[in-house]
């Protein structure tokens, strides 16, 4: 009886013995991730194409920045979402190489699929990939050229290489020095990192990209309030940043006040004047002469009567400061936000040599220059100009990438040749080391090495070159000791890209290979997909 029960029950355990399901899940995950990788492959390099994206709101984005494209793509498959996340991680870590990391991940997944078809266990593949990635980072450091932050020319060349694949590439002679100067100004010499939040990018429609400028200090897009005849320039400014309203108080509940005669009306107006005059006198008493007022969604941040009093007291007023600007302004000017008039004291004010409103390329901006307080972090503002919003948005993304490249060089002061040279060199080293290994690991190293060649292959394809001829030529050159041989778009073939000033930080390439191998490891270790209730 017992035997017959076991015999009957045994087919129900077939699910647990189904060996094909994990393989199908892995293939599905690899296919989805590679589809995303192939979608942005044409965007790589100086001859890469742009993508036009229409968002849910109907907004149009034109970009060839990998992180931006993937962020706005409607990616639904969870494994494909991992590729979006790895591109975002590269954007945070290095700022550049976001397209490369997605393409590398797709290529490594293709290599992993070949190994899985040979019957090699996924854990063994992922662990060997991890070791190969660690060795790749070592090879990249060995072939890199150490630089000093005093060598401004090298920094500018690296920033120019980053901009070469963007719409703004023809303006790189202006934007590259601008990116380098801004990072060096906000850099803390004690720490090997740069907080890019200290560099503020401001977009102004009007003019051309050539009119983009770097301002030492703070730039506000809000205009000075001139309706009451207040000043538009203040020297030796004492700046206050307030988060309360300069208008008569209103009750919390909705109610009506009924006025029966003119004496009551007169009394209300007198009290309103006295209330506002008292606040304005307190502001003047603290020696404040520039007032920044936070934007209010409930009621007017400042009314006409208060503006009249402030102009008579010779105080410059700038209203509608956005909530997300408060932290930057506090950091940049040394002023502390004031939420109540009773806390309005001189020690909460910031100081600057001059605050003035100027007209530039048909639009008005406010400059706060010469902030000299000891506890204030140095900040700079980059005013981007462009014919329309699409150009401005892409200019902002391009400058951000250039800033990140310079930040990478502050973290790791080493440059390598671009144009696929590092990937070919790493591939050559791993291929030669694979021959010394035994067993399955040899196959894995060889596949990893071949997968890295996707970068030079894609660069050649996007430049309209014969990828097989170019990559074969590069392999021969690297075998003969030419470590800096890469694809030169100018020469339409292989050449020494380091001598041609096609440079990139070593951190960009090492980070891309490490993150790509980690993403592949995560995908390979998934053998089932379960849906939660």
From Swiss-Prot:
Quaternary state and interactors: Heterooligomeric complex of about 850 to 900 kDa that forms two stacked rings, 12 to 16 nm in diameter.
Q: Where in the cell is it found?
A: Cytoplasm
The name this protein goes by in its record: T-complex protein 1 subunit delta
Positions the record marks as coiled coil are none
Provide one Gene Ontology biological process annotation.
chaperone mediated protein folding independent of cofactor
Molecular-function GO terms, alphabetical: ATP binding; ATP hydrolysis activity; ATP-dependent protein folding chaperone; unfolded protein binding
**Where is the sequence biased in composition, kind Basic and acidic residues?**
16-25
What family does the database annotate?
Belongs to the TCP-1 chaperonin family.
- The UniProt entry lists the main location of this chain as cytoplasm
Pfam family of the protein (one):
Cpn60_TCP1
Signal peptide coordinates: none
Q: Which UniProt keywords apply?
A: ATP-binding, Chaperone, Cytoplasm, Nucleotide-binding
Superkingdom is Eukaryota
Q: What's this chain's function?
A: Molecular chaperone; assists the folding of proteins upon ATP hydrolysis. Known to play a role, in vitro, in the folding of actin and tubulin.
**Source organism of the structure:** Debaryomyces hansenii (strain ATCC 36239 / CBS 767 / BCRC 21394 / JCM 1990 / NBRC 0083 / IGC 2968) (Yeast)
What's the encoding gene here? CCT4
Compositional bias annotation for Polar residues: 1-15
Annotated region described as Disordered, given as residue ranges? 1-25
Write down the InterPro entries for this protein, in alphabetical order.
Answer: Chap_CCT_delta (IPR012717), Chaperone_TCP-1 (IPR017998), Chaperonin_TCP-1_CS (IPR002194), Cpn60/GroEL/TCP-1 (IPR002423), GroEL-like_apical_dom_sf (IPR027409), GROEL-like_equatorial_sf (IPR027413), TCP-1-like_intermed_sf (IPR027410), TCP-1_chaperonin (IPR053374)
**A single GO cellular-component term on record:** chaperonin-containing T-complex
